Regions:
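N-terminal signal-anchor module of multipass membrane proteins
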Residues: 1-72, 79-94
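Intrinsically disordered, low-complexity non-transmembrane regions of multi-pass membrane transporters
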Residues: 1-24, 203-223, 259-266, 274, ...
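Juxtamembrane interface elements at the cytosolic ends of transmembrane helices
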Residues: 5-7, 34-37, 164-171, 182, ...
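Membrane-embedded helical hairpins/re-entrant loop segments and their flanking transmembrane helices
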Residues: 10-20, 42-63, 240-311, 434-436
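Hydrophobic, membrane-embedded alpha-helices of multi-pass small-molecule transporters
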Residues: 20-33, 160-164, 182-183, 215-253, ...
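Short, non-helical or kinked segments that cap or interrupt transmembrane helices
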Residues: 46-51, 68-81, 126-135, 180-186, ...
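Interfacial segments of multi-pass membrane proteins
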Residues: 84-91, 172, 299-314, 320-325
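Membrane-embedded alpha-helical modules
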Residues: 96-205, 318-430
Length: 442
């Protein structure tokens, strides 16, 4: 007679649970990431199927590079929404989206560069250039820049927006277990049910969609948008600086996973490997026409809830995501979600992005009685919001017209001021002690 499995101390080898349980656990992780992952293409105009494929393949690539040690799922990053909005002119110019994807690919390569620098110079020396006084205000700016688009979507149907918003709030505040981990998915489902009752859903496209199809579309790929044009160069300057914030998000998420599992992944397999894995996954996603990838805090919540820490379960979820991406009819169903629901979800989402930036500053005890820190934060916020309101700065380089967005200017100004102003006493802690990451998601 076999001994009963003790879940209290965590399961590090899930194979002992048997194949049926493994598949169920993998499906659970897929549902945890699902709401947030498909919301990004709905907000940006990218393909849901491509996004799911990139999330699945990106997660598997991440696990290969990290030697299969880190139980992390890579899904769509909300941090780049502001960049996509600027490049596509809030969706008015969807033909520019491939240029944004190409820039996302180069952002991923920036991760790889920083990974190499960490390997050569050490993590503490590199992280001094990206302290919370710089990354916090950048994250705050991302949410504030996106705020008008949330209101625009809400205006199409305030009832659906309110139901979606209220459901997310209730799940976050009073939810228990998986309900608390899946607020976006539940918010969409509840408000979608209301939309069905009120006749706000158009099913015409579902009948026309096939059951099986290839999720990659050549015309949407970032690979073929790398052409040296003005649109491509401007997209690079708009989107690549966002990687500064998302790299710090990555560090926070890896610290959260480390604290949850009880293993220091920042040291083993090392932050250089996790950054490289995330970066290459993001580069691949951009080239294929998907959004940037990032380690998902939702799945860390599932780890804490189930106490099953085997990365194999995450890889099963990644395979499920890949399989689902080959069903165009499923994408058609997702695309029937009314914009009012998207507005309600993004209403709280965009606000929480800014709030998480504030949390980043508070948790790291940034001293705003120090004039140095006040100046850096003030310049970042005004550059981001001010220049965004006037369309950024346009200048010529070698006959090519380049536009720097407000976010790009803010990031560059923050890094420069942090480097030249005296008093940079930030010391990066490579020993995570809490389960709180710097996740840019609800």
């Amino acid at each position: 007679m076999s001994n009963p499995i003790d879940y209290s101390k965590g399961i590090y080898d899930a194979k002992k649970l048997g194949t049926p349980r493994l598949l169920i656990l993998g499906a659970q992780h897929m549902f945890a990431m699902f709401g947030a992952t498909v919301l990004v293409p709905l907000l940006t105009g990218l393909s849901v199927s491509t996004t799911l494929l990139c999330a699945g393949l990106g997660t598997l690539l991440f696990h290969i590079i990290c030697k299969g040690k880190v139980p992390a799922f890579l899904g769509s990053s909300f941090a780049y929404l502001g960049g996509f909005a600027i490049v596509s002119n809030d969706g008015a110019n969807p033909e520019n989206l491939p240029y944004a994807c190409a820039a996302v690919a180069f952002s991923g390569l920036l991760y790889v560069l920083v990974s190499g620098l960490i390997s050569v110079f050490g993590i503490r020396r590199i992280m001094r250039f990206f302290p919370p006084v710089v990354t916090g205000p950048i994250i705050i700016s991302i949410g504030l820049i996106l705020a008008p688009s949330a209101i625009t979507n809400c205006q199409s149907n305030w009832l659906l927006a309110f139901v979606a918003l209220a459901t997310v709030i209730v799940c976050n505040i009073w939810g228990k277990g998986m309900v608390k981990i899946l607020p976006i998915l539940i918010g969409v489902l509840v408000s979608y049910a209301v939309a069905l009752v009120t006749g706000a859903v158009d099913f015409a496209a579902i009948g026309e969609a096939s059951w099986i199809g290839f999720p990659i579309h050549k015309e949407a790929m970032g690979l073929f948008a790398i052409d040296g044009s003005e649109k491509f160069i401007s997209a690079l300057f708009t989107i690549m600086p966002i990687a500064i914030a998302t790299m710090m998000e990555h560090v926070g998420d890896i610290a959260a996973i480390s604290a949850t599992v009880g293993h220091n992944y920042i040291n083993d397999p090392g932050l250089n490997r996790t950054l490289m894995g995330d970066g290459l996954a993001t580069a691949m996603a951009g080239l294929l026409g998907g959004p940037a990838n990032t380690t998902y805090g939702e799945n860390t919540g599932v780890l804490a809830l189930t106490k099953i820490y085997d990365p194999l379960v995450i890889r099963i979820a990644a395979v499920f995501a890949c399989i689902l991406s080959f069903c165009p009819k499923f994408e058609a169903i997702i695309n029937t979600i009314p914009s009012g629901i998207i507005g309600g979800i993004s209403f709280v989402l965009y606000g929480m992005i800014s709030a998480i930036g504030v949390r980043n500053v508070v948790e790291n005890q940034v001293d705003f009685t120090n004039s140095r820190n006040l100046i850096i934060a003030a310049v970042i916020l005004v550059c981001a919001l001010g220049f965004n309101s006037v369309g950024g700065i346009t200048f010529g380089i070698g006959g090519v017209s380049v536009t720097l967005s407000g976010l790009a200017i803010a990031a560059l100004a923050g890094i420069l001021l942090n480097a030249i102003l005296p008093g940079n006493d930030y010391e990066f802690d490579s020993n995570p002690g809490t389960g709180e990451g710097t996740s840019l998601r609800v």
